[in-house]
Every structure is written in C-alpha cells, then in structure tokens.
Design a protein with these regions (language model features):
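Amphipathic, small/basic residue-rich leader segments at the start of a protein or domain
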Residues: 1-117, 137, 141, 182-184, ...
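Active-site-adjacent bridging/hinge elements
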Residues: 11-20, 72-83, 100-103, 196-200, ...
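Glycine- and acidic
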Residues: 20-32, 56-61, 84-92, 107-113, ...
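Internal maturation/activation junctions in enzymes
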Residues: 59, 122-123, 134-188, 196, ...
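A short core secondary-structure module
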Residues: 195-260
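A glycine-rich, basic-preceded beta-loop-alpha segment at the flavin cofactor/substrate interface
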Residues: 249-266, 271, 278-319, 339-366
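Extended amphipathic alpha-helical segments enriched in small hydrophobics
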Residues: 317-402
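Charged, glycine-rich active-site and insertion segments that engage polyanionic ligands
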Residues: 414-433
C-alpha cells in the first residue's frame, strides 16, 4: 500500500507542491512522510492484529450498556493520541494544517488494517460541520472536544418509518420553556449560551457509533422539525432544523454536569460489514432519562431554523468520500490477501511443449494465467478507486486553498465526483472481492 500511496501522492497528485501555499508552508515531503509513517505503524500495531476479533465479537447490549472488545478502546485511544482527528485543522486549535490529500492517504492505513474497528470519520465530519455552522461556543465546547477525542460524534438522519427519505422526518423539536439546565435557571430558552434550547422527541435508526463507552461523551447531530404555530410539522424538507444533542449535558466549559440527557439506546442492528462499530436505534425524549424531571432530549439549535439540511450536507458530502475510501480499502485488503495466498499456494505442474511434467514440483497459483487475470482485476478496481478518492481529496484542497478560478472549478468537479467516489468503490471493490 505504501508504494501505491507514494506514487499517487507525489508522482500524480503532486502533493509536495501544496507546501508552496501559505496554509501548508510549514510542510514538506519530509513531514508528509512522517505522518504516513506514524499512521502505518499505529495501524500495524493497534488495528491489523484485531481485525478478526472485532468481526467475530460483535458489540453486545445487555439492556443497559454496550460492551465492545478492549482492542476497540485501545485503537480509539491510539488514534486520538496521534492527532489525526484534527490533522487538517488550524494550528491554533491543535491541528497540523495538513492537506486533506495527505490526511486521506494517511487514514487509508487504518482502513486497510481494519475498517471495522473505527468510525472516526463521523466524529471528524461532525466537528467539521460545527466549525462551519456552529457558534463560537459550540465550536469550543463540542467541536474541539471531538477533535481531541474526548468526545465522539454521530449524524442522526434516518428514521424507522421514513428510511432515508428526509422529507418524512417526524422527530419534533419544541422550545424548552423550563429553566436552563446549563445556567442558573434564569436564562430563557432562546438565550442559552450553547444555542437556542429545544426538547426533542423521536426515533433515529441505523446510527453508527450511537452508543459506546469509548469517549467521555457522544455528540449527536440530529435532524428534526420545529412545529409551526398550528402545532403541525412543516411538510417536506423546508422545515428541517439541525440540533446538537449530547448524550451527557455539559456546561459552557465543556465539563460534564453529571446530568444524563434523554437519549436512550433501544437496540443494536446486526450487520454484515463494519461489525466492530455499534449501529443503533436511538430513542430521543421517551422519558427514560428525564432532564429536570421532564421527558424530552435537550438539544441546541445549529444555524437557523429550517436550514438544517443545508448544514448537514456539509457533513454528508465529507462522509461520502470517507465511505468511498472505506469501500476502497476493503477491496485492496482483499487484493493483498489474495496476492499473498497466490504467492504461497502450490497447485499444478508447469506446462511445457509436451504438456504437464509430473516430475516437476508444483508451481504457485500466481503463475496460472487465469489467477493472474483475477489478481490484475482486483488490483485495477482497488487502485483505481484509491486514485479516485485521493483525487477528490486533492480537489478539496484546491477548493479551499487554490486561486479563485481553480477553486470554483474544483467545487464543480466535486459536485459531480463526490457521489461517484462513494458509489463506484462500493460496487466495484465488492466485485473485486
């Protein structure tokens, strides 16, 4: 994998040239390689040896808490300590100001070692959304703690009755008229320092990493509708708003208050893939964990009412590239396993002019023409998908740091290529395996 990444980064995408830009001026190939070396080592030590463990030991829910293998916690802590959660962020918030191109390449090592053991892309995407659309205090309290690994994040869109049809979202959010749970009781709901405060009720399905004990807190980003003056929900997507709903309530310094929010795990979904990560059904506001004696999950509005979907698309587009990379690395992991097996498995005799010579030792199956064909097909699908995803990452850097005309062109290209970066590897890297 390393030689392939080096070729794509330096010979094709010219990642070194990014250091000529002001944002990346402190970087060089030396620093890029140091990041790749570190990630390769952590993936080799903390991820790869436990890939089978997290596949056969699914998360377990006993009705009260979720249990995960210790290897998952160890990998989470090692990843957080590496600084990769905030690698692309500004120096002043603890980031490395690393180009997204290099960031994506470095994360490939974790995905190929064990995609199942981590869902850090959700925490990063969650925090990135808040850095763009959140208030200064929301960034400080929630996003920065996600970048450090102290908190983790989710995105809660789908619902049991609606699937992925967001226009049919039925989760409700009403202003929290009760005394503030984060202040001295005198702050009106719409003046809470963490954002306008609402109470949410509803159910969210297929939420990855929706419940675990890997981090101190879980920051749920939840799509919900605020009822109109008549008490009815606005039909379609126009009425959808976005809310921060922490598993545990916090104060304005990000400290846990000791109050559990009214978010309850109803059950875990069993999956064919990504089995080391919880996939959950979450109940918001059912009253299992009442706050201030009342049912309803406390949530803080992000952005403007009715504009939640536009905010969430910031995270969804980023997640699409991440999911595409995950599928890509599953395909490449399969290829590397196939290649290793083909190099070591003897089968059949060499064929000469007179046919097979039974006196000769068996040959490795990689020497069979049809096996070569299949291996080359796997390699083409996997490395082609990797090139596509890294090209999209390079476009992200161009959009953010390029000249105006180049940045606009990169934005347009991303609009076209981002859905492909998710869908093509998801189909053809499965075909490769």
């Amino acid at each position: 994998l390393r030689s392939t990444l080096d070729f794509l980064l330096y010979n094709w995408l010219q990642a070194e040239s990014l250091s000529a830009r002001e944002r990346f001026a402190d970087h060089s190939r030396e620093t890029f390689d140091a990041v790749l070396d570190t990630c390769e080592r952590i993936a080799r030590e903390k991820y790869a040896p436990f890939n089978r463990t997290v596949d056969v030991q699914e998360p377990h829910f006993d009705g009260e808490r979720v249990t995960l293998p210790q290897a998952t916690k160890d990998a989470y802590d090692a990843y957080a300590a590496s600084g990769m959660l905030s690698a692309a962020q500004d120096y002043d918030i603890g980031g490395m100001q690393l180009p997204y191109t290099v960031d994506a390449a470095a994360n490939a090592f974790f995905a190929v070692a064990s995609i199942s053991i981590s869902s850090s892309l959700l925490s990063v995407g969650n925090a990135n959304l808040l850095m763009v659309h959140g208030t200064d205090l929301q960034k400080k309290v929630f996003a920065l703690n996600e970048f450090s690994g102290r908190f983790s994040g989710t995105m809660c869109l789908s619902e049991p009755q609606a699937g992925s049809s967001l226009s049919d979202v039925a989760t409700r959010a009403v202003p929290d008229e009760a005394p503030s749970v984060a202040a001295d009781g005198s702050v009106p709901w719409d003046q809470d320092p963490l954002g306008p405060r609402y109470r949410l009720t509803g159910n969210k399905m297929w939420i990855s990493s929706g419940e675990h004990d890997l981090s101190e807190n879980i920051v749920h980003l939840v799509l919900a509708k605020i009822p109109g003056p008549d008490g009815k929900l606005v039909p379609g997507t126009r009425g959808i708003s976005l809310f921060i709903v922490p598993k545990k309530l916090v104060d304005t310094e990000g400290n846990l208050t000791g109050v559990r929010n009214d978010v309850a795990l109803a059950g875990l979904n069993h999956k064919l893939g990504w089995r080391g990560t919880t996939n959950t059904l979450l109940n918001f506001g059912e009253g299992k964990y009442p706050v201030e004696g009342r049912a309803g999950a406390v949530g803080y509005l992000v952005g403007q009412p009715g504009k939640g979907l536009a905010c969430m698309f910031h995270m969804m587009n980023e997640a699409r590239i991440g999911i595409g990379m995950a599928a890509t690395m599953l395909g490449l992991a399969g290829y590397y396993a196939s290649l290793d097996y083909a190099k070591n498995r003897p089968q059949g005799r060499p064929v000469g002019q007179g046919g097979k010579d039974a006196a000769q030792p068996q040959v490795r199956i990689i020497e069979h023409a049809d096996v070569k064909r299949m291996l080359l097909a796997q390699k083409s699908y996997g490395e082609g998908a990797l090139a596509l995803n890294l090209f999209c990452a390079r476009l992200v850097d161009e959009q953010h740091t390029g000249a105006p005309e180049a940045a606009d062109e990169a934005r347009l290209l991303l609009e076209v290529r981002t859905p492909i970066a998710k869908s093509w590897p998801s189909e053809f890297c499965l075909e490769a395996n």
